[in-house]
Amino acid sequence: PALGCTVRGIDAPCRNCNTGNVGNCDNITTGDISAGVQTGYCRDTSGGWSDSLVAHQTQIHIVPDDIPNTAAVLVEPLSCALHAILKVTGNHDAESTTPSVLVIGCGTMGLLTIAALNAINFNGTIVAIAKHPHQAELAKKLGANDVITPQTTLYADLCSRSGAAQYQPEVGKPTVLGGFDATFDCVGSSDTLDDALRFTQARGQVVVIGMPAIPKGVDWTTIWFKELRVSGAYAYGMEMVNSENRRTFEWALNLLKERRVDLSEMVTHIFPLADYRRAVGTAIFTGHHKSVKTVFDLSDPCTS
């Protein structure tokens, strides 16, 4: 979790923390603990690969007994997905004015983005791009209307789904006129960022969920020409839910408790901690192992 003003012991919170958006804290280098944006990136807190870590009481959430551990372990990334989709759908109890969305990437975040849209009863069309067949299958189960593989006919496939038209310039990738009303880039690579801009309808919105680093070869002319809105989606905070502000984590837990979202097939591999090498390999080579989310079982100290 983000290390905002409250965690840092700062009495007068910055304007972002004051509104509950601790992921955008202005004071990540000051306060009672060392500099760092999140747990795991601060020497005073340690992180998930340490023998132990430190958490502030505001970062602790009670998981209801009727939510299984395999679902609870996904509350944090589900919160990130919920935070992201509201940038497009707005207040989730209002009828969506976004007819179509494209989700690029069907790893954990892409699949959870689809699940989150389905959980809030998004009434538009969801098209996803999945690299592996097992990801495509799960994307459809979670609510995607159509899933495409990133092959040589990708542009033609997406144009046929969105009613757009592609034109091949003398140099470079195709130009797309029309497209999806909103695109969620859940990969964040140079190629996917460039494609996201091209696949999005004029005056549409691109939400960057995957960490983009320093992209190369992205044609920003598309942003200018199509007047696109491009926004990042980092972590979580406070959201407008049923016309009231709620912490994203609490909302995610409530959706799971009410069975509004089924993540039972997201955790595909469970390992004891002692088998960490095989666990890491399974997580890295997704296509070979047909893995989605790989987790450790720490419930039995004898096997951990």
Summary of predicted features, one role per range:
Residues 98-106, 118-191:
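Adenosine-nucleotide cofactor-binding segment
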Residues 140, 190-258, 297-304:
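Glycine-rich phosphate-binding loop and adjacent beta-alpha segment
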Residues 1-60:
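Glycine-rich phosphate/adenylate-binding loop and adjacent beta-alpha elements
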Residues 171, 194-197, 246-304:
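C-terminal hydrophobic helical "lid"/dimerization subdomain
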Residues 66-67, 88-100, 122:
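Short helix-loop-beta connector
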Residues 121, 188, 201-202, 261, ...:
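Short conserved AdoMet
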Residues 43-49, 65-89, 104-112:
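A glycine-rich, Thr/Ser-enriched phosphate-binding loop motif common to dinucleotide/cofactor-binding enzymes
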